[in-house]
């Protein structure tokens, strides 16, 4: 039995540290090596922003060979015109891409983001891929007994095992393009805070700061790395993830890399002119620094005085010095605590009381404050107000009128189908205000805008827009404003006779504004009713829209099949509740094919023909057979339905929106048609009732 003394004299060796700090012997750059789960170390270097990237050095980094790769599968790339092998790198712990070079008989790492790794393509056998060379040779890539990469070549039927070669990784390719070029990741960064003397002092201070610091998080029980960033002047806290092989910021908010009063161990005090300078040992960066106490902020400020540190002057007393604030007439005692760190006490009613620690203003904190203030001043001085040319009131109005006229002309060219080079036909001569109002009313009737807010009309039955009420409102307002602008422009150009002008209120203009306001409120009510109709439809459908993302070709060939279950359910429900079951296509074998193909790839012509049939049923639900309809009337209905369907299709961005707008249009048309039928039925029932009463009265008289 082994004695206890032997066990204590030979303790178990401690595990190697996860992070090791050092310098690259070739480039003299600070690097940190990370111990990976495969017990191999990989070196990283920092950027000026505080990020860690793989260190590009052939001396520090381990040489990766093909035995570090476990092949998974290979896919063909059209861009590279070669097979791309997906393999797991046991050194970096990542899935990487490689192509085989027949000239050197080795693998070259590539990075093609468009080729994504798919675990479903994993080859289960030993042979992964067979590659044909330019000279007729065949190279077989397979897995060995350990699952690592091995390759064999055959020529004239004889197989031979190829030796293991080094990998040409992306890091080696970068070194080949620009060998030992460290300009991008150098530590020399031009910084400026507006004070050149302080910038030089801060640059010297930065040289003494450690680039990396290894800390232990007591809250998460993790070891993390503090990386210094010159651009921000702060430390970035990173932890290494073994599963992904990457660094990420630590999630603990309690662990910081800032210098606090607990990090300052006082050594001795020395007077310099009228101030007392404390020489301290900073445990955060392991440096000997100088600080003074600021009675205004109740904190310590780092300074650099012409005082040489002398370890022979270190004192062991508790009290260091006393400071007095003239404003509040308080005395502050700066002393060494029982743990040997800085401690502050202030005089109170019951004697001296311990003060709470505050932030320490190191050179880093001072530089950030000065830089922020300098950037604010620079931004305020460089801010230039935009200089606009001085315009008179007449010129401003004229520019507005011309802009309105140009906008109206563009819209008019689109409606007439003219190009920008073609001239617009001249308009009729200007009429009086009464005639202008009549023309406006006629135009509103042509646009099919409802005059009764309780019964919104649908313009689809006459080829209008069934869903663009707001667009009609904007178009009408632009037309009215344009006519007023043109009238003002013509009046400004015509010479007016000299006469005595007396002020009279423009009644016609006031009436126009009043009608415009009434029309706008009426349109708002119509929009509200449209929203209410859509809400009711959604409630009837159970607030479900089950629309397939794509239509198969076999289903699309059936014109009568509904395009969506939700649409078929809603349409059948409306037809069952409000209209009898009809089919106006009995005896009609034609189709409503469109003359031009649409640019919407998500719709097919069969679905569009089916929707035109839905609209025709909504336009004329009383007709049971097409043969009963007049030929011209039937053509007109088809034209209106095609026009309405085309407008809905152009206004839709996807199939769901197309079905929603189509269902809303069918609901509105059916509602309007049913109301007309009810009125006609009531009128027909009233006439025979009145005639029978008269016959009864005449019979009594006789």
Swiss-Prot record:
Residues 450-471, 545-564, 675-702 are annotated as: Disordered. The keyword Cell wall biogenesis/degradation does not apply. GO terms for biological process: autophagy; regulation of DNA-templated transcription. A motif (LIR 4) lies at residues 469-472. A motif (LIR 1) lies at residues 107-110. Residues 39-160 are annotated as: Required for self-association and interaction with pgl-3. The record marks 105, 246 as: Required for interaction with lgg-1 and lgg-2. InterPro entries: KIX_dom (IPR003101), KIX_dom_sf (IPR036529), Sepa-1 (IPR039908). The LIR motifs (LC3-interacting region) are required for its interaction with lgg-1 and lgg-2. Self-associates. Interacts (via the LIR motifs) with lgg-1; the interaction is direct. Interacts (via the LIR motifs) with lgg-2; the interaction is direct. Interacts with pgl-3; interaction is enhanced in the presence of RNA. Interacts with epg-2; may be modulated by prmt-1. Adapter protein that connects P-granules in somatic cells with the autophagic machinery. Association with other adapters such as epg-2 and P-granule components such as pgl-3 is required for the accumulation and degradation of P-granules by autophagy in somatic cells. This ensures exclusive localization of the P-granules in germ cells. PANTHER family: IG-LIKE DOMAIN-CONTAINING PROTEIN-RELATED (PTHR21504:SF1), IG-LIKE DOMAIN-CONTAINING PROTEIN-RELATED-RELATED (PTHR21504). This is Protein sepa-1. It comes from Caenorhabditis elegans.
């Amino acid at each position: 039995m082994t004695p206890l003394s032997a066990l204590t004299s030979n303790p178990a060796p401690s595990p190697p540290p996860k992070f090791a700090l050092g310098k690259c012997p070739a480039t003299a750059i600070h690097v940190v090596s990370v111990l990976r789960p495969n017990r191999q170390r990989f070196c990283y270097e920092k950027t000026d922003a505080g990020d860690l990237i793989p260190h590009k050095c052939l001396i520090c980094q381990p040489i990766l060979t093909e035995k570090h790769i476990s092949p998974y599968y290979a896919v063909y790339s059209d861009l590279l015109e070669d097979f791309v092998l997906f393999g797991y790198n046991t050194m970096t712990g990542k899935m990487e891409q490689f192509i085989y070079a027949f000239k050197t008989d080795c693998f070259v790492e590539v990075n093609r983001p468009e080729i994504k790794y798919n675990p479903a393509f994993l080859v289960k056998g030993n042979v992964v891929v067979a590659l044909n060379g330019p000279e007729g040779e065949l190279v077989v890539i397979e897995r060995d007994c350990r699952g690592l990469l091995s390759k064999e070549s055959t020529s004239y039927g004889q197989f031979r095992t190829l030796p293991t070669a080094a990998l040409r990784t992306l890091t080696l390719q970068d070194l080949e393009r620009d060998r030992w070029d460290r300009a991008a990741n150098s530590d020399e960064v031009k910084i400026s805070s507006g004070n050149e003397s302080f910038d030089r002092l801060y640059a010297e201070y930065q040289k003494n700061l450690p680039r990396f610091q290894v800390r232990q998080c007591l809250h998460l029980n993790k070891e993390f790395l503090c990386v210094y960033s010159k651009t921000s002047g702060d430390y970035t806290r990173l932890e290494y993830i073994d599963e992904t092989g990457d660094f990420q910021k630590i999630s603990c908010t309690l662990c910081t890399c800032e210098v606090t009063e607990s990090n300052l161990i006082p050594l001795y005090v020395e007077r310099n002119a009228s101030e007392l300078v404390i020489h301290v040992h900073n445990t955060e960066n392991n440096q000997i620094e100088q600080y003074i106490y600021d009675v205004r902020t109740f904190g310590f400020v780092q300074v650099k005085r012409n005082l040489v540190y002398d370890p022979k002057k270190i004192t062991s007393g508790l009290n260091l010095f006393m400071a007095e604030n003239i404003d509040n007439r308080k005395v502050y005692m700066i002393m060494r605590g029982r743990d040997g760190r800085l401690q502050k006490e202030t005089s109170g009613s019951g004697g001296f009381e311990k003060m709470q620690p505050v932030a320490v203003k190191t050179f880093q904190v001072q530089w950030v404050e000065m830089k922020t203030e300098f950037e604010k001043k620079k931004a305020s001085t460089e801010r230039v107000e935009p200089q606009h040319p001085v315009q008179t009131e007449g010129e401003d109005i004229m520019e507005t009128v011309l802009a309105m006229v140009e906008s109206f002309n563009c819209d008019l060219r689109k409606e007439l189908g003219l190009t920008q080079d073609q001239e617009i036909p001249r308009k009729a001569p200007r009429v009086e205000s009464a005639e202008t109002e009549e023309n406006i009313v006629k135009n509103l009737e042509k646009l099919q805008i409802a005059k009764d807010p309780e019964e919104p009309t649908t313009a689809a039955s006459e080829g209008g827009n069934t869903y663009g009420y707001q667009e009609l409102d904007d178009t009408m307002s632009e037309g009215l404003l344009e006519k007023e602008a043109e009238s003002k422009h013509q009046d400004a150009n015509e010479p007016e006779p000299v006469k005595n002008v007396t002020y009279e209120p423009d009644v016609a203009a006031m009436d126009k504004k009043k009608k415009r306001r009434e029309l706008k409120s009426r349109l708002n009510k119509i929009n509200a009713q449209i929203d209410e109709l859509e809400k009711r439809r959604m409630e009837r459908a159970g607030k479900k829209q089950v629309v397939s993302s794509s239509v198969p070709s076999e289903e699309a060939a059936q014109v009568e099949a509904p395009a969506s279950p939700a649409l078929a359910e809603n349409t059948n429900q409306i037809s069952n509740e409000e209209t009898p079951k009809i089919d106006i296509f009995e005896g009609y074998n034609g189709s409503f094919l469109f003359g031009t193909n649409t640019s919407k790839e998500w719709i097919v012509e069969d679905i569009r023909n089916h929707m035109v049939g839905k609209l025709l049923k909504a336009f004329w639900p009383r007709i049971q057979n097409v043969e009963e309809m007049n030929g011209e009337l039937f053509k007109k209905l088809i034209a209106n339905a095609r026009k309405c369907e085309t407008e809905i299709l152009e206004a839709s961005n996807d199939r769901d929106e197309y079905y929603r707008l189509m269902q809303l249009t069918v609901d509105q048309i059916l509602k309007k048609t049913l109301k007309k039928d009810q009125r006609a039925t009531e009128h027909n029932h009233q006439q025979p009732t009145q005639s029978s009463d008269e016959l009864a009265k005449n019979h009594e008289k006789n």
